[in-house]
C-alpha cells in the first residue's frame, strides 16, 4: 500500500505540471508472488510459462489491474484525462486488460515488430489484434520499432532467413542488406499501420528511414546487454545512435561535442537537412501521412476487400478511406 501511494503521489506531481502522458515500462511486472516457499527459477519465466491465465509468478498477475484502476481514476481527474500506455510483454489475449478504459487505456502491440513483411502475415496479425480488442472493448496500439529492437527498415531489407543476432555480431557483413528495399518496405508498413483503427507509436529516426548502425566497435558499445549476455548479443546501441540533423559536422548537428555513440558517414544523406529538401524523402512521406491520418479519422472499424494479387492487401474505413499495400519486392 505504501508503494502504491507513492506511485500515485509521483504521477500526480507530474500530471499537475502538465505532463500529458505516461509510458509504463515493464508494466507486467509490478506484482509478484513472493509467498513461501519461494520458487527457484533458473531463468525469468517467459510468455510460454505465463500463458493467458494471469497466473505468472513474477509477471502478468491479475492483481496488477487493481493498481492500474487506481491510476486511471487519478488520470481521469484531469481535463483532458492523462494518457498512459503499457509496455507489457504478455500473451496477446492479455493485452486488452492493460488497454482497458478502466486501466491504462493503451498497451503497445508488438506483434508487427517480428511479423514478416508478407500480405498474409500482416492481415492475420491485424485481424487477430482488432478482433481481440473488440471482444474486450479495447483498442489497438500499433508500432514497428522501439529502442530495444533492430530498426525495422533494416529487418525488411534482410533475407528473412538470416539470423539477425549473428548478423549483428558480424557487424552486418555476413549477409547483404538491401537498404533501398528495406526503406521502401518500411515506408509501406508505416502507411499501412497509420491507416488502421487505433493509435500508432513511432520510434525516433524511423521518420528519416534510418537503418541500424551495425558496425559500432566493441570499445564504443554502451549497452550493458552486450556484456551481461557474455557478448553473444551485440545489444541495442545500433538503433540508439543520435539522429543526424545536418549533412555534416562533428555529430551531424546533434551537438557541438560529438556523439556518445559513433555515427556512420552515411548518416549525412539521411539527415533532416537533406530530407527536408526532397519532396519524396521518408521525412516528407511521414509528414504527409500524419496530416492525412488526422484529416481522415473515422470510426474504429475496418473492412477487407478482395484483390487479384495475394501480395496486395486492401482495406477501407467507414468514411471511404482506402488503404492498398503492395507487399511484393517490386513495383506493382
Model-derived segments and their meaning:
Residues 1-332:
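Active-site and adjacent substrate-binding regions of carbohydrate-active enzymes
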Amino acid at each position: 500500500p505504501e508503494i502504491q501511494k507513492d506511485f500515485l503521489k509521483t504521477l500526480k506531481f507530474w500530471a499537475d505540471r502538465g505532463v500529458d502522458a505516461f509510458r509504463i515500462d515493464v508494466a507486467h511486472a509490478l506484482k509478484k508472488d513472493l509467498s513461501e516457499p519461494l520458487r527457484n527459477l533458473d531463468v525469468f519465466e517467459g510468455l510460454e510459462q505465463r500463458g493467458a491465465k494471469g497466473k505468472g509468478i513474477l509477471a502478468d498477475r491479475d492483481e496488477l489491474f487493481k493498481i492500474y484502476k487506481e491510476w486511471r481514476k487519478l488520470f481521469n481527474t484531469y481535463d483532458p484525462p492523462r494518457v498512459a500506455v503499457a509496455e507489457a510483454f504478455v500473451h496477446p489475449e492479455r493485452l486488452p486488460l492493460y488497454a482497458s478504459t478502466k486501466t491504462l487505456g493503451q498497451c503497445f502491440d508488438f506483434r508487427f515488430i517480428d511479423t514478416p513483411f508478407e500480405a498474409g502475415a500482416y492481415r492475420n496479425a491485424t485481424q487477430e489484434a482488432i478482433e481481440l480488442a473488440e471482444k474486450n472493448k479495447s483498442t489497438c496500439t500499433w508500432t514497428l520499432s522501439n529502442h530495444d529492437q533492430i530498426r525495422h527498415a533494416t529487418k525488411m531489407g534482410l533475407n528473412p532467413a538470416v539470423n539477425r543476432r549473428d548478423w549483428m555480431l558480424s557487424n552486418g557483413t555476413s549477409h547483404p542488406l538491401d537498404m533501398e528495399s528495406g526503406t521502401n518496405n518500411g515506408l509501406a508498413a508505416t502507411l499501412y499501420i497509420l491507416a488502421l483503427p487505433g493509435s500508432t507509436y513511432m520510434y525516433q529516426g524511423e521518420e528519416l528511414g534510418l537503418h541500424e548502425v551495425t558496425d559500432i566497435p566493441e570499445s564504443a558499445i554502451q549497452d550493458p546487454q552486450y556484456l551481461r549476455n557474455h557478448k553473444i548479443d551485440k545489444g541495442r546501441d545500433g538503433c540508439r545512435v543520435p539522429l543526424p540533423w545536418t549533412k555534416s559536422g562533428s555529430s551531424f548537428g546533434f551537438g557541438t561535442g560529438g556523439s556518445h555513440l559513433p555515427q556512420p558517414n552515411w548518416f549525412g544523406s539521411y539527415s533532416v537537412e537533406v530530407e527536408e529538401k526532397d519532396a519524396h524523402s521518408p521525412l516528407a512521406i511521414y509528414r504527409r501521412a500524419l496530416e492525412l491520418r488526422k484529416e481522415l479519422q473515422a470510426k474504429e472499424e475496418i473492412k477487407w476487400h478482395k484483390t487479384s494479387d495475394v501480395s496486395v492487401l486492401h482495406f477501407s474505413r467507414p468514411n471511404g478511406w482506402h488503404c492498398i499495400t503492395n507487399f511484393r519486392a517490386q513495383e506493382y
